[in-house]
UniProtKB/Swiss-Prot annotation:
GO cellular component: cytoplasm
Family assignment from sequence similarity: Belongs to the elongation factor P family.
GO molecular function, one term: translation elongation factor activity
Name used for this protein in its record: Elongation factor P
Main location: cytoplasm
NCBIfam families: efp, PRK00529.1
Coiled-coil segments on the chain, per record: none
Pathway where this protein functions: Protein biosynthesis; polypeptide chain elongation
Organism the protein comes from: Methylobacterium radiotolerans (strain ATCC 27329 / DSM 1819 / JCM 2831 / NBRC 15690 / NCIMB 10815 / 0-1)
Biological classification of the source: Bacteria, Pseudomonadati, Pseudomonadota, Alphaproteobacteria, Hyphomicrobiales
Length: 188
């Protein structure tokens, strides 16, 4: 289906020269002089090569039909990351390069959105927030309640982030999956 280039967003899949590309970054640029353009950073699905393209904002681009389905993460092994469709219990193995930066945040039983084109997994979308345990951080210092400074911490999945001074090792915290930033102390 043809769409105007300016409507493309991160995660969309486009077809160019018979090959499929997933959009990693999309930006509409409106210079003071000249025609507006849409800058797309894409990854070719077949071999993972990154490509950068510029289109006029009114230019038509072929968008591939992609099915977004909810899947449950089961486990990972040498073949990749294994997910199950909760509707028909069908399992699918997703290669490591498709999962990418999402790998540390995957937890057994987690529901994720998987984009599939002709049975081939293209992209994975995590929930916005996940709850993880702080594995290691500096000790809590008394009297540091007034400052808004944060201290470095390592989470149970190996991701490094910054947390408020009152958070100690072993505390469960909620973090954003997009950038690993601290949101709040877990309520459970």
């Amino acid at each position: 289906m043809k769409v105007i280039a300016s409507t493309l967003r991160k995660g969309n899949v486009v077809e160019k020269d018979g090959k499929l590309y997933v959009i990693l970054f999309a930006e509409n640029i409106h210079p003071g002089k000249g025609t507006p353009v849409t800058q797309l950073d894409m990854r070719r699905i077949t071999d993972g090569v990154k490509v950068s393209e510029r289109y006029r904002t009114t230019e038509q681009v072929e968008r591939a039909f992609v099915e977004d389905r909810e899947h449950t993460f089961l486990y990972s092994d040498g073949e990749g990351f294994h997910f199950m469709n909760p509707e028909n219990y069908e399992q699918i193995a997703v290669p490591e390069d498709v999962v990418g930066d999402a790998a540390p945040y995957l937890q057994e039983g987690m529901a994720v959105m998987l984009s599939v084109h002709n049975g081939v997994p293209l992209t994975i979308e995590l929930p916005q927030r996940v709850t993880l345990e702080v594995a290691e951080t500096e000790p809590v210092l008394k009297g540091q309640t007034a400052s808004s400074s944060y201290k470095p911490a390592t989470l149970s999945n190996g991701v490094r982030t910054t947390v408020p001074p009152h958070i100690a090792a072993g505390t469960r915290v909620v973090v954003m999956t997009a950038d690993g930033s601290y949101v709040e102390r877990a309520k459970d």
